[in-house]
Amino acid sequence: MAQFTLYNKHSAPPSSESTRVDCEHVPLCSINDVQLRFLVPDDLTEVRQLCQEWFPIDYPLSWYEDITSSTRFFALAAVYNLAIIGLIVAEIKPYRNVNKEVIANMSDSDELYTRLSGFPMQDKGILPDSMGRSADVGYILSLGVHRSHRRNGIGSLLLDALMNHLTTAERHSVKAIFLHTLTTNQPAIFFYEKRRFTLHSFLPYYYNIRGKGKDGFTYVNYINGGHPPWTLLDHIKHYASMVRHTSSLCAWLAGRVQQVVRWFYHKLLTRFNFIE
């Protein structure tokens, strides 16, 4: 693995207008001839063309403008021979806002792939209420790799960069990373499960593909001490552990009391024999 390097599209020092805030906290890797860099406004046309080839989604122009210029998004590209061959787009947001937002359908065309709604209510159960009040979460909007470069670790490289970005001390408040995927997208499911994402919930008719509702999954990866809400079984295990701990403590105290009683009895007996 090569040393970590910073790659800029124009081979010039990054400017404040074309780089992401806090980009110095993101390890930008170079593996062989593949390098990672943040998107810049000049990437809009190329990224739009790639997304139209990779995904059957008709994103509005404003979406491409946002991910190539706004600091709201973590938008990272994998570059080979000056061409973008992979892309990850993610967003950090307060957990309490996850279910307050509604994402409009990307297109009215039946030939295009659109979401029926915003974040489903099932996503509200990603974190416990006590933790979620002050926690942030990372949401992966898009992760794609050019067909000719798949199975070469490009997707893992992009995801690792995001994970490293979210597990720094500055972002300890981010307790989970989650995403949505079609239940029929087996390659994506296999990829995320291999990367320690776990199935959180089933989303019936979450997607609209060519006018037909399609089911989706929510997958979650817990980081920075985050964990899912406790189930009844978790509570039972917790209290059982407390009982075992209490029983062990009682047994230890009983043993200590017995030792003290024996010592006191021995002292009394010794003193009585001495007096006689």
Swiss-Prot record:
It comes from the Eukaryota. Substrate binds at residues 59, 141, 207. Residues 204-215 are annotated as: Required for homodimerization. The keyword Calcium does not apply. GO terms for biological process: chromosome segregation; N-terminal peptidyl-methionine acetylation. The active site is at 139, 180. InterPro entries: Acyl_CoA_acyltransferase, GNAT_dom, NAA60-like. GO terms for cellular component: cytoplasm; Golgi membrane. This is N-alpha-acetyltransferase 60. It comes from Drosophila melanogaster.
